[in-house]
Amino acid sequence: MQMASRKVIAGLMVLALCITTLSSAGSDVEAKAKASLKTKKISVKVGKKKSILIKNKTKKHSYSFTSSNKQVAKVTSKGKVTGIKAGKATITVKEVLKKGKKKKGKKKKRTLGKVKVTVTGMKKKNVATPTPETVNKATPTATPSATAPVEPTASATPATTEPAAPTPIVTRSPAPRPTLAPGMPELDKNNLTVADYPGIASDVPDLDIIRVGQNYYMVSTTMNLVPGVPVMKSTDLVHWEIVNYACNRFPDKDLFNLENGQQTYKNGSWAASLKYNEKTKLFYVIYNVNNDGFYCYTTPDIENGTWKAYYIQTSFHDPALIFDGDGMYVIYSGNNIQKISLKESSAEGGIGKVVKEGSSRALFNKTLGGFKWSLWEGAHAYKIGDYYYLMIIGSYGSWFRREVCYRSKKLYDSKASDWEAQLIFEGSTYEYGTGIAQGGIVDTIYGDWYGFLFQDHDGLGRVPSILAVNWDYVDTKNNKYYPDWPMMGYYDDKGNFVNCLGTSQKVKNPLTIQLNKSDKESYIVGDDDFSYPDFKEGDSLKKVWQWNHNPDDANWSVTENPGYYRIKNGKVAGNIWFARNSLTQRTVGPNFTSETCVLTENMKPGDYAGLAAISAHYGMVGVKCDENGNRYVFQGCNSDTNSGAKAKKEDKIKENAVSEEKIEGNAPVYLKIEYAFNTGKTRADKANFFYSLDGENWKSIGETFSLGFDTATTFM
C-alpha cells in the first residue's frame, strides 16, 4: 500500500522545477554578463539595516524585493533590509524590464535569486511592565465567560500567518528550573522548531505526554484498533513517530474478536494516561475500556520493551495516573480519586490484577469556581512544586471545549476546602473555530513549559495543538495576576504572551518552540511494500499499521506470497464492520492519498476486497465477485446511514457503481482514495474513489463520499 500527503507530492514537483530552471540557466554561460546577486546570505541585528547589492545592473531594468516574513525582516524597493525581530526570512529579488524596452525573445521579468536573511538580537524597549505587587491576583473562583460559541464561517479561509517571536523563557515556575544534565544538547537559537496549527493534522485524541531526559513520549486513544495505545516519540514536540504500543492485543473476548455480533467500536482503549516512576524505573500506561474494565501496563523500556498487563473489572472513566510518595493513585470522572496497587499474575505471561486500596471519593465539588459543566472529564494530574494540579475539560454546552485547572497542596488526604479552581484556556485557533481542551502539560530540559490539547475537526478526527504555558502571567489589560497557574495561550507579534479566556478568542500565531528542531522528519503514517523476509510467528508489522479489532492470526500472512499482505476469509462477514484482519492507518490533513494494489484470483462468489475510508460510516473502492464468479471493480458504502450506531452485523455493503471491465486471471487491480479535509473553511470533508488496471491510467468511480465525526459509531 502506498500513502502520500499531497504536500509531499507538491514538494517533489517543486524540486523538479528547480532542476529544470538550473539546467536552462546553464545554457547561457557564454552570453554577456547579466545582473546577479553579490551575496546570497546576510545577517542583520534587530533595528539595524543592511542593503542587498546587485552586480552588473543596467538602466533598462528595475529591481523588486519581496520578504517571505515581514515580521522578521522588511525590505524597501531599493533593497534595504531592516531587522524587525530575531528569526529568519528570505528576500526574493526580481529583475523587471522597464516599459517600452522589451525586445523580441526577451523576458520582461526574471528572478535573480534569493537572499537568506538572519536577524539576531532583540531591541530593548523602555516599557514599564506591571509587577505582581501592582496588580490584583486573579480570583480562582471567578465565574468564566459565557460568551456564545463562535462557529467558523462557511467560506472563511484562514489568513496566512507568519510564526511568532521565539517564546520568552518563563521567569517564574512553581518548580525549580532544571539543571542541564551532562550530554544534553545546548539550545541553538538559530535552529528552533515552529509549531503551526493543528500541531498534528491527524486523529490523535485524548493525548497524554511526558518527558524523560530529552525525549518526549505521547500516548493516545485508538479505540477498537490493535495493537492499542500507540507510544509516539519526539525530541522537538513537533515531529512524532510511533515507536511502540502498550497493548499488543486485546484479551480473547467476543467484543474484541468481532464474534457473535459483538464489537468494541467507540470503546476499546480509551483516554490513556502515561507516567514514568523514578523509583521503580518503570513506565506506566492506564486506560479504561467501557463495558469491560480498567487496564494498566508497565515496561522498563518504553521504546523497545514488552509490557506487563494488569486488569480489574471496574470502570475509571478518563483516568489520570499520579504517584505520590509510595502511593499510586487514579483520578477519574473529573474529580474522583482511588488508590490502587498492582499484583503480579502467578501464570507466566498472564494478566495481573489491579487492586483497589480503600474506597474512592470526590476530591472537591464540581461547582467549585462557579462552573456549571455539562461535560466534565479528561483528567490529567501532576505534582509540580508545592502544588498538586488536576486539569480537566469542561463545557457549558454547544460542545465548546475549555480547559480548567484545580490545585491543592494536598492530594489523597486533602479536604474539599483545600482546592482552588481556575479557567486556564478558553479559545480556539485562527485555523478552526471549536474550542481546544483535554490534554496535558510538559516541561523541557531548558525549563520552558507547553500545553498539548486537542480539538474536534469533523471528518479528520480529533487533532492536537501545542500552546505556550505561562506560570507567572500578568494580565495588564484586566489588572490581574495568575501566580503558579499554568495559563495557556500564544505570543503576539511583539513577543508578548496572550492568554485566551473567551470563546471568541483565537490563537493567532504559530508557536516557536524553545527546542532544537529535529533533523529527522517523522510521521505517524507510512508506506509498506509488505516485504518482510525475516518475518516469523509473533513478529509485528510496521508500527504505522493497526488491525480493526484483534486479528485472526490463522488467516493472514506476509510470507505466503512475499511482497503482499494476504487475507483469507476465516468466516463470512456481511460488511466491513465485522470483516476481520482489516489493516488501518490514520489519514492526514489537509489532503491525503492512499493507494493499494490487489490480486483477486482466489476470490469466491459473494467476496469483496479493497480499500475503504472509515469515519462515522464507510465508503470503499474494491473488487466484487458476483454469484457467477465474475470479478468487477465497484464503489460502495454501508447501507445503514442513520445517525445512530451503524456498526451492526446485519448491515450490508451498498454498491453505488460497478465497472464494465471484467477482471481476468490474477491481473492486478490498483485502487486509490483521495481525501480533502476542509474543516474550518467549508467544513465539507470528502473522499473520492479511483481505480486503474495498469497502475497509470486512473478512472473515477462512484460517488463522492462525505466524511464525518460520530460519537455513536466509531468515535473516530
Q: What do these predicted ranges mean?
A:
Residues K123-T179:
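Ser/Thr/Gly/Pro-rich low-complexity, disordered linker/stalk segments of secreted
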Residues L17, K40-V44, K50-I52, R110, ...:
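Generic detection of short hydrophobic beta-strand segments and adjacent strand-loop junctions
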Residues M1-L12:
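Bacterial N-terminal signal peptides that target proteins for export
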Residues P144, A154, P166-V170, P174-M716:
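Carbohydrate-active catalytic/glycan-binding domains of CAZyme proteins
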Residues I19-D28:
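C-terminal segment of classical bacterial N-terminal signal peptides
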Residues G11, T21, E95-L97, T111, ...:
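Feature for long, exposed domains in two main contexts
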Residues S27-P132, N136-A138:
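Extracytoplasmic soluble-region selector
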